[in-house]
Every structure is written in C-alpha cells, then in structure tokens.
C-alpha cells in the first residue's frame, strides 16, 4: 500500500536541530548542510560521500536532483592507473586476433628471410631481374601484413584504453556556485518544488 507524503512533514532547516538532521540516503546524522542543489527542507541534507556514491552508480540518470531537477556541479576525476579495474567485455576480439596474427606472420617472414638467404639471392648476378622482383615481393609481403595488423592492434588498444578509463572515472560533487540565486527562490519555484515533493510516493508497511 502506497501513501502520498504529507507536506506537513517537510520542514525548514531552521526548524530542525542539528541532532535531528540526517542524510536522506544513509539516514544517519549529518551536521553539515551542503548546497548541492536547489532543494529546501530536510531533502537538502546529505553526506558528500553518500551523494557521490549515489551519483556514480548511474551518472546519466543521477546527474541532477530527482526533486528540484537542478543539475549537480560535477567534476570528473580518474582513478590512479594502479587502481584501475579492467573488464574483459571492453576488449574486442579483433585485438587478440590481430596481435596473434602479427606475431605469427612476422615470425614466418623473419624465418623465411633467414633460412632461404633471400638477400644473397637478390644480390647474386646469376638471378634474373624478374626473379629478384619476385623474391623482394615474397620477402616484404609478410612484413607488410605484419605492419598492417600491428597498426590495427594499436587502434584496438587505444579503444580499449579509452573504454577502461571511462569505467574508472569518478565524479565528485561540489557545491553550487550560484549560492545567491539558490537562496532567492521566487514563489513560482516554490510551487514547483511543493508539487515535486507531493509526487513522491513512499511505501508504507502493510
């Protein structure tokens, strides 16, 4: 059974003692009243750590206040690279294929170049020019393929690095810069705030 929140329970901060103020996320005491959004009353009280953890669970959805809809003042920060968490799903299969292909083809080209003594055959005057062109093409082919696969592997590594860096991004919340604008809320904004709070539905125990 759901009941609509009674507006009489939404009080001003001036009417609440420091001992009664509690974070709306963890419900524990909070003696500091931050200025992260345009909310008023007890909906404004929240720990910085709790709010940041709540925002980082889904930045796209939680980047603004759910009640007053004012965007949070967020600042991006990356974790230390030694503390990064890597995810296998971000790694494309083509990266592993290209790395393996590069090593195999490059190794075959090196073995072919050394074992058959192609350099001596190319320098020999007994070999015709057509044969020399064929030998040069045959010796350079594996290295060209290896170079192309290496370029592709580098591109995949860059893509994987960017995806991993985004997953290890932390959004820190700071207090709003336009403090005076927040404090001077007109009557229309007050009505919208009341309507927003009235729409909150709290599940009551059966």
Swiss-Prot record:
GO terms for cellular component: host cell endosome; host cell Golgi apparatus; host cell membrane; membrane
Subcellular location: Host membrane; Host Golgi apparatus, Host trans-Golgi network membrane; Host early endosome membrane
Protein's name in the database: E3 ubiquitin-protein ligase LAP
ZnF endpoints (RING-CH-type): 15-75
Family matches, as SMART domains: RINGv
Topology feature Lumenal, residues: 115-129
GO biological processes: protein ubiquitination; symbiont-mediated perturbation of host ubiquitin-like protein modification; symbiont-mediated suppression of host antigen processing and presentation of peptide antigen via MHC class I
């Amino acid at each position: 059974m759901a009941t609509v929140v009674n507006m009489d329970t939404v009080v001003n901060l001036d009417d609440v003692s420091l001992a009664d103020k509690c974070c709306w996320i963890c419900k524990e005491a909070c003696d500091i009243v931050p200025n992260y959004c345009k909310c008023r009353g007890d909906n404004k009280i929240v720990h910085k750590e709790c709010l940041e953890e709540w925002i980082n669970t889904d930045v796209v959805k939680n980047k603004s206040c759910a009640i007053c809809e004012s965007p949070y003042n967020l600042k991006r920060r990356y974790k230390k690279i030694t503390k990064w968490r890597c995810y296998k799903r971000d790694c494309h299969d083509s990266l592993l294929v290209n790395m393996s292909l590069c090593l195999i083809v490059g190794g075959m080209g090196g073995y072919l170049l050394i074992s058959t003594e192609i350099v001596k055959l190319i320098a020999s005057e007994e070999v015709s020019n057509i044969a020399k062109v064929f030998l040069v093409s045959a010796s350079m082919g594996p290295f060209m393929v290896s170079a192309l696969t290496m370029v592709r592997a580098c591109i995949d590594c860059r893509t994987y690095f960017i995806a991993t860096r985004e997953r290890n991004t932390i959004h820190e919340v700071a207090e709003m810069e336009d403090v005076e604008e927040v404090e001077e809320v007109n009557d229309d904004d007050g009505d919208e705030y009341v309507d927003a709070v009235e729409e909150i539905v709290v599940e009551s125990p059966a």
